[in-house]
């Protein structure tokens, strides 16, 4: 039973581990395996996840959300704030953390509305938040795991990365605002009810300040001003000394998934027949192949897999970010919202899945059309 539960909870890690082990039969372990592992990506990813876990434990993001919601005076403003928290928040705190924080928060906030309004808004708003987190996160190298990895691999400057994804981010924001306006058009113009009470927790300002400083150190490592080892050591030592329990909230399964895929991809690259076949498929079709691969494997594994067989990293960045749209597993972050719906509104799972799939496909078609038009 424990194994079955683990496989269900850690499906991607389990598949990655099996693939890594199978590839070892074709390429027996040797010293070259050490070259497979991208320590820079793992170190920075661990550091960022630790910092975000610490800030989340201190209720920083919850308090930010409440401060913004206190200024809302209409249903449209309420929806725009809830969606905007995920869209803009994901650029800094990653798509996973923004959904883990703000989707449960949304259920609490919407519970203060009239029943009919609450039922009309909940499913569309959570769908919008999920798309917002996935598309907002594509703007920055730290917005999601595949961006962090591909940014490090590309050698781009921060400005080059931002300019690459900026056009898609702007169109995404406009689409989300238009959707919010359409959803709220039939609702009452003013919000009903009050904000939920602040949980009785006391934030440790020293830890918040420490995490803020460590976050700046990590950013310097991301843009290659500081060695990644310095950032990793600073985060690990400071967290062990000041906020050790936060380390229990780090997503170690994601780190292990990266390691497994690094081994699998490294071994595939040493199998000439497969390497040549995949390179031929990718040539000139990097964006579309990345989008399609993401629908089946999700965009993080797609980025890890395809990056070993093409030098067109910019195209993979576009493809894996747009590829986060589509199926429910195209971005693993989308499962966070689905699980929340299944827990809070189990009878609405079907309606959510239909709206999620339809809206994702519409966004994907529009953004792919934009990619075709601007040619990058």
Say what each PLM segment does.
Residues 159-203, 335-376:
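Juxtamembrane and boundary regions of transmembrane helices in multi-pass small-molecule transporters
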Residues 36, 58, 62-65, 213-311:
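Transmembrane helical segments that form the transport core of multi-pass membrane transport proteins
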Residues 2-9, 30-41, 156-168, 200-205, ...:
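Interfacial loop-to-helix junctions that mark the boundaries of transmembrane helices
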């Amino acid at each position: 039973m424990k194994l079955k539960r683990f496989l269900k909870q850690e499906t991607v890690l389990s598949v990655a581990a099996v693939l890594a082990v199978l590839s070892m039969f074709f390429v027996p372990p040797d010293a070259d395996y050490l070259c497979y592992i991208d320590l820079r990506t793992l170190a920075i990813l661990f550091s960022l996840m630790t910092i975000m876990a610490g800030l989340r434990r201190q209720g920083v993001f919850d308090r930010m959300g409440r401060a913004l919601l206190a200024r809302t005076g209409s249903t449209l403003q309420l929806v725009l704030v809830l969606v905007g928290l995920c869209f803009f928040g994901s650029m800094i705190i990653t798509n996973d953390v923004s959904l883990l924080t703000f989707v449960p928060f949304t259920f609490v906030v919407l519970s203060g509305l009239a029943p009919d309004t609450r039922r009309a808004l909940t499913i569309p708003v959570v769908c919008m938040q999920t798309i917002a987190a996935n598309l907002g996160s594509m703007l920055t190298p730290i917005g999601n795991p595949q961006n962090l990895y591909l940014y490090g691999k590309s050698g781009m400057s921060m400005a080059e990365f931002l300019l690459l994804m900026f056009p898609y981010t702007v169109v995404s924001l406009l689409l989300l605002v238009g959707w919010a306006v359409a959803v709220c058009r039939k609702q009452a113009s003013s919000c009903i009810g009050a904000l939920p009470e602040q949980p009785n927790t006391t934030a440790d300002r020293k830890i918040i300040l420490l995490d803020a400083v460590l976050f700046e150190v990590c950013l310097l490592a991301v843009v290659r001003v500081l060695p990644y080892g310095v950032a990793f050591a600073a985060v690990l030592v400071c967290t062990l000394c000041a906020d050790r329990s936060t380390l229990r909230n780090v997503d170690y399964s994601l780190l292990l998934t990266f390691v497994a895929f690094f081994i699998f991809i490294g071994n595939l690259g040493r199998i000439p027949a497969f390497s040549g076949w995949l390179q031929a498929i990718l040539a000139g079709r990097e964006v579309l192949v990345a989008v399609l691969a993401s629908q089946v494997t999700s965009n993080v594994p797609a980025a890890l897999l395809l990056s070993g067989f093409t030098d067109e990293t910019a195209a993979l960045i576009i493809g894996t970010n747009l590829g986060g749209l589509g199926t429910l597993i195209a971005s693993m972050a989308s499962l966070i919202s689905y699980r929340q719906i299944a827990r809070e509104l189990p009878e609405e799972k079907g309606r959510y899945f239909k709206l999620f799939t339809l809206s994702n496909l519409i966004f994907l078609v529009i953004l792919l059309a934009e990619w075709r038009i601007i040619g990058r």
